[in-house]
């Protein structure tokens, strides 16, 4: 299984891009991962792409870091197909796009710029992996 991060839009803020790169490099030590930036909402046709598709969405399921770690651990142990996480741009995703996903998750009840959402998600994915491994990053 490989994890794919599919993000709409390019990162424009240097400090955000540095943070995203840092967490991406850290995550690569734990799991196979790719990250793709795209201009369009539907970079992969979810109906023809095998895998488990998850959209980050403000109305998605809220989880604590520990619950997210448990969710990721379940995916890693039970999912043979690739897992896709979709992070929207400034306009988010259409309902039609979101309805094609198997799951929606939310990072917070608060609203963030899409660039920061990407950074926050990668940090949470890294945190989840360290929780799974019993490492001391999460306190």
Swiss-Prot record:
Coiled coil: none annotated. S-adenosyl-L-methionine binds at residues 56, 88, 107-112. It catalyses: pseudouridine(1915) in 23S rRNA + S-adenosyl-L-methionine = N(3)-methylpseudouridine(1915) in 23S rRNA + S-adenosyl-L-homocysteine + H(+). Pfam families: SPOUT_MTase. One of its GO terms (molecular function) is rRNA (pseudouridine-N3-)-methyltransferase activity. It is found in: Cytoplasm. InterPro entries: Alpha/beta_knot_MTases, RlmH-like, tRNA_m1G_MTases_N. Keywords: Cytoplasm, Methyltransferase, rRNA processing, S-adenosyl-L-methionine, Transferase. Its main location: cytoplasm. It is an enzyme of class 2 (transferase). Its EC number is 2.1.1.177. HAMAP family: 23SrRNA_methyltr_H. Specifically methylates the pseudouridine at position 1915 (m3Psi1915) in 23S rRNA. This is Ribosomal RNA large subunit methyltransferase H. It comes from Coprothermobacter proteolyticus (strain ATCC 35245 / DSM 5265 / OCM 4 / BT).
């Amino acid at each position: 299984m490989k994890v794919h991060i599919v993000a709409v839009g390019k990162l424009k803020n240097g400090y955000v891009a540095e943070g995203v790169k840092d967490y991406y490099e850290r995550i690569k030590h734990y799991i196979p991962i790719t990250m793709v930036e795209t201009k369009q909402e539907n970079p992969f046709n979810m109906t023809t792409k095998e895998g488990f598709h998850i959209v980050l969405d403000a109305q998605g399921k809220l989880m604590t870091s520990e619950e997210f770690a448990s969710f990721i651990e379940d995916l890693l142990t039970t999912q043979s197909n690739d897992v896709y996480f979709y992070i929207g741009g400034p306009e988010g995703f259409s309902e039609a796009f979101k309805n094609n996903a198997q799951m929606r998750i939310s990072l917070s009840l608060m609203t963030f710029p899409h660039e920061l959402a990407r950074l926050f998600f990668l940090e949470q994915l890294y945190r989840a992996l360290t929780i799974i491994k019993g490492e001391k990053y999460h306190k």
